[in-house]
Structure formats: structure tokens, C-alpha cells
Amino acid sequence: MKIGANYTPSQGWFHSWLDLDIDATRRDFEGIAQLGLDHVRLFPLWPLLQPNRGLVRPRALDDVVSVVRAAGEFDLEVTVDALNGHLSSYDFLPSWVITWHTSNLFTDPLVKAGQTDLISQLATRLREEPNATGMTVGNEFPQYAALAPGHHHPTRSECTVDDAQTWLETMLGTMRDQWPDGRFWFGFDDDLWFVDDHPFTPRHAVTQGSATTVHSWVFAQVGPRFGEGHPALTWFPRYLLELARAWSHDPERPLWLQEVGAPRTHVPDSSSAAFMTTTMASLTSTPGLEAITWWCSHDVSRDLLDFPELEYSLGLFTKDGKPKPEALALSDMLPDLHNAQPQHQLDEPLEFSANWDTGAGRSVCSPMGDLFAQWVDQAEQTGRAPRLALRPTPGLTDREALASARAH
């Protein structure tokens, strides 16, 4: 199993792409490598890469390549998110899709042409770098279609389930065309698993891309429901992975825990190391789990204003590069994590019912529901993660779904 970090630059956060200091980047990567981590996930900003639909800036692409090569100096593999998009509550959208040029990010043909142009040029550059392994479409890009109460995007791009499918196939297909040997992913927040009418569905998650990604955050629902210190917080990432396995018709489908972190809203400093070790211990036996990527590498500086409070302290390192207790705990666990072996789950699964095609009914899996509470109780009683199983529902047959999954 690979263990890495989502790279948040210690100097200037993602605004550092404006005037890249490659020496500062090297210092960050040196610290990450000294912990024993083996990969980083990078987030160049879409408006800087492509300020006009017809202009993908060569200098901006050069900067991405420079950072990839700097990571390679410390034997770190790299994946790159293309359309960023959305990061830590802030949207980074180019001027040609907002305000007077407001356009639908998922259905407008001109916008999609611009997106594929950027992805194509970025993939063409990255495929030449030996430590670059692949690309994610963008960080939690489906949040631009979010419509759940409290999560409804203020300038939402409406789309249907079929529109979402077409958009994903177009973006991922462009990556494959330009980088045949690369690996490609679709990253999303957990609304996809829990919101019945979200146009991006679990079916998309488990059939699109090289592996199913999971983003595990306890600050939204699990923490508020169960409270600080409850076992549900450290079991939640495993629950999401089991949910991903339940939706997939392909038993060989790989999994990537692309984001998991310790928000201080529900994990105080005094518990951060224990949260790390307990969370990781729950993950080691997960069938198909090939990588875990902690969010994030470095704390956000307090000099940067107006972030949600929890965003300032999610790093493995302080902004000055000092490893925090959870970083040291992770480093100590690396031999066990690298050698982790999946365990067969022989117990009867906990079943739920939802529609394979549309995702309708998926809200039964929400952390606010009975299924999750029952799953956590059973995990605590047995010390093992229970399986989940999706009951047969109207939609594709198992044979058709498996063929679709393997085709993508």
C-alpha cells in the first residue's frame, strides 16, 4: 500500500503558483520524504493554467513540471489534479466561465472544449515525467452540481445523471488518449454517496477511472452527530471504502483513499496521534485499497485570512515545516501499512437498497442514518469492518454492470 500526502505548499498555500519558489517546494518535499511517504498529489490552479479558453499558458505548465521534477528528487511519485476548481472552501474558476461569461461547467460545449484542451496539454507534458503516475479530473469538481441543503452551490451548474456520465467520459477519455500509460481518477466529496438527487452517482464513482476514490471528512456529519472521541470518527474512512465496494460490480476494482484528515473541530491536538493510528489500523485490512493520501502536508499560515477555522491545522507539518504528532505517528506505522494484507470478510453483510442507475435511495447510507450507526456498533463489537451489500434494484443487470465497469 502506498502512503502519501496532498501537497499544500507551506509558503503561500496554493497562491504560491503565482510566483513559484522551487527551493521552498524542495524543502517541503524533503520533509515529506523524510517521514517516509512515497507520493504527493498536486493542485495547480485552473485560472492560472488557462486564463482564457484559447490560452493554456506554457509557463504555467512549466511550473507544474518543475514541481513534479522537484518531487522526483526525493523519490516521490506524483499525481496531478487538472481542474482546480475547488480547494478548502474557495473556488478557482477562470473568468471565461463566471459572472458575465457564466456557463455550465458540465454541459456547455465550449467549456468542455476548453477543459479538454487543458487536460490534453497537461497530460502531454506529464507523460514525459517518470515519477508522474496519472491525473485526477479535478478536486471535488462535482460540488459545482451540488444541490443538497447546506451544500447547494451558489452558482450551480445544473446537469442530469446522463450529463454527468458524458462529462466524465469526455474528460477521462481525453486523459487516456494523451497518456495511454497513465492512470486516471474521478475525485468527489461524499455527497455523491449520500444525496439521493445528486447528478453524480455511486455508479459513476465505481465505473469511471482507474480506481474508486474516497474522500473521508468527519467534520460535516459524523463529528456533529457522534461527538469528539467517538469510534465512529475513526471508522468512517473504512465505512466509505466498504460502501464503495458494495456499489461496485467488479470485485477487483482498486480503491484509493484520496483524502482523509484530522479536523481540529472534532480531533483536538491531544488526540491527533491516536486518531491517526486508530484510523490507519482500521484501514490495513481493506480489500483492494492501494493507496492512502493524507490531507494535508502543511498547515495554512494564519497570515492568510478568512479560511474556515479547521483548514488552518490539517497539515502533517506546521507552516514552518515541523512535523506534528500525527505525522510522527504515521511515520512509525509505515512498515505495517506498506505490508498490509487484505482480510476476507466472512460475516453476513449489512444490506441496503438503492437504484444503481440513478442513485435514488442512497441517503439510507448517510452517517446520519441507522445503517451507519449499526455498522459502527458491529465494527466495535467484533473489531472487524462489516461488509455492506447493495440489494438488487432496477437498472443494469450484474453482467451488464460488470462489463461497463471493466470497460472504463
Listing of model-derived features with the role each one plays in the protein:
Residues 22-97, 157-186:
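Aromatic-lined substrate-binding rim segments of carbohydrate-active enzymes
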Residues 41-46, 83-111, 115-158:
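Active-site groove signature of glycoside hydrolases
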Residues 1-39, 69-73, 77, 176, ...:
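N-terminal carbohydrate-binding accessory modules
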Residues 16, 115, 282, 286-408:
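Aromatic-rich peripheral "rim/lid" segments of glycoside hydrolase catalytic domains that contact
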Residues 11-22, 46-62, 99-114, 141, ...:
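The substrate-binding groove and active-site-proximal loops of carbohydrate-active enzymes
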Residues 17-33, 115-123, 192-205, 272-282:
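Short, acidic/polar
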Residues 1-3, 36-38, 72-78, 128-133, ...:
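Short, well-ordered coil/turn segments that N-cap beta-strands
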Residues 158-166, 170-265, 289-290, 299:
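Glycoside hydrolase catalytic-domain groove-lining segments
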